[in-house]
Amino acid sequence: MYVDAHGDFNDTNTSPTGNIHGECLAASAGLGLPDLTNLYFEGQKVDPHNICFVGCRDLDPGEKVLMKKAGVTVFAMSVIDRQGFSEIVKKVLKFFEIHADWIHVSFDMDVLDPMYAPGTGIPLPGGLTNREALLQMGEMASIGNVLSAGIVLVRPSLDV
């Protein structure tokens, strides 16, 4: 599960900036330059059909196309706002019931609205509340098959 304001699903053809940190998830899915896709071992690390993305609100146009083409499941903030967070949590849990025996959660602090957590590298208004994030992580922990998790892009010097 990828919880992030940004897609990190660009490749060299879709990235408007060329920043490598915007290509890491696509590279893990086997898309992009061989120098990235073949780190540690050759080829795909994660089947993109098993990626569930929650909370994005700043996707590049080419990145959106690449995610859709690859089969990534995306619950953008616009979808969360329309359907309600509790409904999306149910859909995420159902997704993992079908798609994964074990789950890694990547939680980027910029998924949170900077009103609640400004201590991140790329703050972007319109994100999850702290309560929504706690609910999501609590529900993920309760299903019992989260094998690992990482909390990334934390900048305490900018936090309150």
Language-model features: where?
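Active-site histidine-anchored catalytic micro-motif
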Residues: 1-38, 143-147
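Conserved beta-strand scaffold positions in the cores of enzyme catalytic domains, especially
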Residues: 2, 51-53, 74, 148
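Active-site flanking residues adjacent to catalytic metal/cofactor-binding acidic residues
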Residues: 3-5, 54, 105-109
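Short, glycine/acidic-enriched loop or turn micro-motifs at the edges of active sites
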Residues: 7, 58, 109-113
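Solvent-exposed alpha-helices and their adjacent loops that cap or buttress functional pockets
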Residues: 18, 42-46
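A general structural motif
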Residues: 32, 52-60, 129-131
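Aromatic-lined glycan-binding groove of carbohydrate-active enzymes
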Residues: 48-50, 57-62, 99-103
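Catalytic cores of soluble, metal-dependent hydrolases
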Residues: 66-69, 73-160
